[in-house]
Design a protein with these regions (language model features):
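Polytopic transmembrane helical bundles with strong interfacial aromatic enrichment
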Residues: 1-43, 50-120
Length: 120
């Protein structure tokens, strides 16, 4: 299933996206300090690679183990995996982009619902 590959790509990107800002996190005032909007959104973007990666891995392995497939759920989970970090990083520097969080969140919620429906 493509979701397993997407999971491992997400893990790789999560490592890279954590290593690069990690070079600068020691600066107390970097990007406005620890609690600043940009710094929080960069952390969220970094961790979203791992979080949605685990959801993709779970969907892929569960699908294989139970012989359950749902193409719409698979595509929606991939949309969530691609758009969540994108919206996080865009929102970090242009707060207006925060209004797009419904796209990745809705994709993941709908993907999970559709996949769960196929399992029941």
């Amino acid at each position: 299933m493509i979701n397993i590959s997407a999971a491992w790509i997400g893990f790789l990107l999560g490592g890279i996206s954590g290593a690069v800002p990690g070079l600068f996190f020691h600066g107390q005032n970097w990007l406005g300090g620890y609690a600043s909007w940009p710094r929080r959104l960069i952390r969220l973007g970094h961790i979203s690679f791992f979080g949605i990666g685990f959801l993709n891995l779970g969907m892929g392995l569960t699908g294989l183990a139970l012989d359950v497939t749902s193409a719409p759920a698979s595509v929606l989970m991939l949309v969530g995996a691609a758009t969540m970090p994108l919206v996080c990083y865009a929102s970090a520097f242009r707060p207006l982009f925060r209004h797009l969080f419904f796209v990745p969140a809705g994709s993941v919620i709908l993907a999970t619902s559709l996949f769960l429906e196929r399992m029941v």
